[in-house]
Amino acid sequence: MSDPSSKNSSLRSNFSPPPQGEGKKPLAAITPSNIAPLATDGFGSAMEIAARCNTLAELKAALEAFDGSQLKKLAHSTVFADGSPASRIMLIGEAPGHDEDKAGLPFVGRAGKLLDRMMAAIGLDRSTFYITNVMPWRPPDNRNPDPGEVAMCIPFLRRHIELAQPKLLILLGAVSARHVLGLNDGIMKLRGRWLEYRIGTEMIPVLPTLHPAYLLRQPAHKKLAWRDLQAAADKMEAFGLPAKE
């Protein structure tokens, strides 16, 4: 991929990539097994509703009207997505925080600002990628969602991926990696490794990496995220992305 502009170079500097001498380690490629989410009372209903949605607009409306989640009743807004739906690069985070719940958009707080700098470092912005979360509703007090709450959202997330038709997925954090891929490995074991996600008969390359909120708490690990972004940039260049279809 071509070098970012001088503006992006400044943003890349703010993201603090590691010294050039560190280089990149080879990335392992594995294919995850499919693990069904936990069954809950409303899971079948969520599957039926999600399956009937034929466009992203219909899916958004279905989520906003869905009454099978206690989290939705406690949240201020349904946080659906941001960025360009036409992009073939899709990012998936974990759940909205306070700022996202208030704005109705994903990644608008401090973690979102760091994410924008991270993506700018490889020449992307929200006009050239698409972003959503596993959970469209904020758990109270930013607590971790319980397995049943996550399971209720999985049919909508899977349909979201199918309708967005990405050519490359970047998973931000452990919750996203675990529930998109059906793997129980920790994010430190998964990050930087190319995996695959099936959409119909097509296998989509997937790269888990560290969540920006984690990087705010552990800035020394930004160098690991930078290696992952370099790997993503290489894959995008090979695929001719971020071309829109």
Where on the chain are the PLM-derived regions?
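A polyanion-binding, active-site-adjacent surface
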Residues: 1-15, 24-245
